[in-house]
Every structure is written in structure tokens, then in C-alpha cells.
């Protein structure tokens, strides 16, 4: 929905408190205690002003996500409400793993983003399937299984590059990944079936 900027990271116990400027997000519609996804990670608003808000990020969240404890631009999205239009796929804000950018290069008028994902996500990453990268809903174009995890590519149109932080990515950048919700439940169902003791 908008790009914000982390401007004041502060230590908070083993975690961190972040102040994020968000002049284009429409914070007048967000209350204290409501959720905003920051680079794909669902966070709770603890304070807010007209064009900024604060979140507390626990040590657990820091260990499971990338890029939430440093200065810089972040993708922001308010929680969807019943009746809102759905574009892309449903994203919950629960990060499933951290990926590493292999490359980002321009191909004709679009861009090809290649990411190496953790091995545990391999069953949920499929050709033409959906995945969220730093909170951006995208479609997987190619998948290659490697010994260290699935390597997949995504085609990015110029508009996506303009309105998200993905254009800041480069080789070795770390990104938050959230697999498709349906794929997650299918994987869980398969695991239970293999156990033969569901009921």
C-alpha cells in the first residue's frame, strides 16, 4: 500500500522499538493496537502520529525476520477489512522463512528477481504459485531445487518496482518470505497423512 522509512530504531530489552514514517499510508484509519505489516511481518501499532507510528519488535520476531532493525525503506500494508477488494493472494503477515537474493537484473522492460529460499519451504514453492517477498504478493515463474534449498525467479513489472522497496534489493540481500496459505495447509495435511495416526 505504501513505502515507509524506519527513522528511529531504539533498543527495547532484547528487542527493538521502531518509529516508522508513513505519510502515504492513511494512518487516520489505524488505531492503537491494530496491525500493520512491515516488510511482510505483522506488527502491532503501540503509538502513532499523523504521519508516523511505532511498533515493538521482540527478540523472537527479530530472529525470524530480516531488515526490521535497521534504518531504511520498508513496505507497509494495513490489515485488510471485510469487504475490501482482494488483489493478489491472501497474505497473513506471518513470515515463514528468510530468503537470500541471488540476483536482480533487467530483462527487456521488466526485471528478473532470483531468490534462494530455505529448504523447509521447498514443498510450498511451485511454478506459477504465489509467494510474498517483503510483503509483496508475487507469482513464481521458475523453480529449481538445489542442495541448499529451492531457488526461484519472479518477473517484476516496472510499476511493482516503483511502488515497493524491491528496487533496493541486490545480490545477498535478505528478504522475508511468506508462502501461500493454501500451500501451507496442503503441506500440513500431507504430513499428517504420512503419519497414519491422524485420529
Give the location of each predicted region.
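Conserved loop->alpha-helix
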Residues: 1-199
